[in-house]
Amino acid sequence: MYLTREEERILAGEEGEARAKALEVIVKVGEAVGAERLIPIKHAHVSGASYMTIGDAGLRFLARLAESGARFSVPTTVNPVSYDVEEPGAIPMTRLSPRIVKAQSEILKALEAMGADLILTCTPYYTEVPRRVGLREGDSVAWGESSAVAYANSVLGIHTNREGGPLALMAGIAGRTYFYGAHDPEWRKPRVAYRLETPKVLDETEAGVLGEVIATQHRDEHPPLLDAPLGGEAALKEFSAAVGSAGSLAMVHITGVTPGDPGDMIEEVVTMDYGDLARRMEDLAPGFEPDILYVGCPHASIEELRRLYRALSKAGERAGRRTVVSISRSLYLQALREGLVEKLKGLGVRFVRDSCLIVSPFSSGARGVRVATNSYKAYFYLSKKGVEVGLAPIEALPKLVS
């Protein structure tokens, strides 16, 4: 692999052993996939920060890194953790042991020592981070959160491979990643197109199910091209989360949304019918009265909070008291300033910052609990943990509670 003089200096340990080791990892992975050079990144986002996800082994790894003097060389942010840092008991039906609290606290301490910005969200694109870092279309980053990776490539035109948590961590320390995959303009040109014949604009749950279909069908190494009407930011967010959870796609070129020229390399066109999508929606619809109405996977946007308030205002108190919203601390503060938090709490809604039902102890101890959500990703992961999950858009959720 070709290295610049600066990269050779880093690898030789002139900027510390920790940064040299991090760059060595990036180089070895790059060589394994055939990358010919490295590129600088402007930002890293580390996934796998929850103790429920990485356990004691992950804690020891991060603690050793911090003790070795490892420091992030580019702005680096962090995914959600096991609980709301300021209100640990915020997640309902969840037993949070002192051991989990202590271990999670040590993980955060190690990441903070390395210079991480503890925004603790899976939606860094909703925070002030892109503006603060100066991220623009075409910039390269190293993100580890699958839903954010798909959103960055497909909606924002920011370039990132789907990095594992440790690799995003190493990229943040090294300040480099390998030139391959989503960083290569040629790779970003689709060869297979999917066209959905539909009489309507898709809401976020339909978009999520469409994401499942695309992710499980697509086999080409290049990203697919999608021609389908996705209705607004929630639909784009849930679609991105679905293609990242049901499969391993890092990007879908969405007609009319994704920046940049998709090129003219299409070799195959797959036509899909809305009826097939509707039948899958029926399979996933709640056939029960839920114990929890859940919004915010990935973390909720301000627009979703507004929609939720309008929907709950028309429903009874019972629906509000069963509603849980997970959200980034950054957007929670914005919603607080707009009066949305007070309005929703007045209806009984519970907020969970810094965390979510998936990466908290809830997902391992909620067997038998019934959850209705607008998120395909929440359905995908919670149903694997023995939770009964049904899918419905925000406007339909309160109507499920009698």
Curated annotation (Swiss-Prot):
Q: What GO molecular function annotation could you give as one example from this UniProt entry?
A: metal ion binding
Describe, as the record does, how this protein assembles with itself and its partners: Heterodimer composed of a large subunit (PMDh-L) and a small subunit (PMDh-S).
Gene Ontology biological-process annotations: isoprenoid biosynthetic process
Instruction: Describe the thermal dependence of activity.
Output: Thermostable. Treatment at 90 degrees Celsius causes a loss of most activity, and treatment at 100 degrees Celsius results in complete inactivation.
How does the annotated pH dependence read?
A: Optimum pH is 7.0.
Question: What pathway does this protein act in?
Answer: Isoprenoid biosynthesis; isopentenyl diphosphate biosynthesis via mevalonate pathway
Entry protein name: Phosphomevalonate dehydratase large subunit
Query: Residues that bind [4Fe-4S] cluster, according to the entry?
Result: C122, C297, C356
Species of the source: Aeropyrum pernix (strain ATCC 700893 / DSM 11879 / JCM 9820 / NBRC 100138 / K1)
Per the UniProt entry, the effect of C356A is: Almost loss of activity
Name the UniProt key words of this record, in alphabetical order: 4Fe-4S, Iron, Iron-sulfur, Isoprene biosynthesis, Lyase, Metal-binding
| Catalytic activity field | (R)-5-phosphomevalonate = (2E)-3-methyl-5-phosphooxypent-2-enoate + H2O
Residues annotated to bind (R)-5-phosphomevalonate: G48, A49, S50, N79, P80, E145, S146, K377
The answer, when asked if Signal is one of the entry's keywords, is: no
**Ways its activity is controlled:** Neither the addition of 1 mM Mg(2+) nor 1 mM Mn(2+) has a significant effect on the activity, whereas Zn(2+) causes almost complete inactivation. Strongly inhibited by H(2)O(2), but not by EDTA or iodoacetamide.
Q: Cofactor stoichiometry and binding?
A: Binds 1 [4Fe-4S] cluster per subunit.
What function does the entry list?
Answer: Component of a hydro-lyase that catalyzes the dehydration of mevalonate 5-phosphate (MVA5P) to form trans-anhydromevalonate 5-phosphate (tAHMP). Involved in the archaeal mevalonate (MVA) pathway, which provides fundamental precursors for isoprenoid biosynthesis, such as isopentenyl diphosphate (IPP) and dimethylallyl diphosphate (DMAPP).
The record's family statement is: Belongs to the AcnX type II large subunit family.
List the cofactors: [4Fe-4S] cluster
What does the record give as EC number? 4.2.1.182
Instruction: Work out whether the entry's keyword set contains Mitochondrion.
Output: no
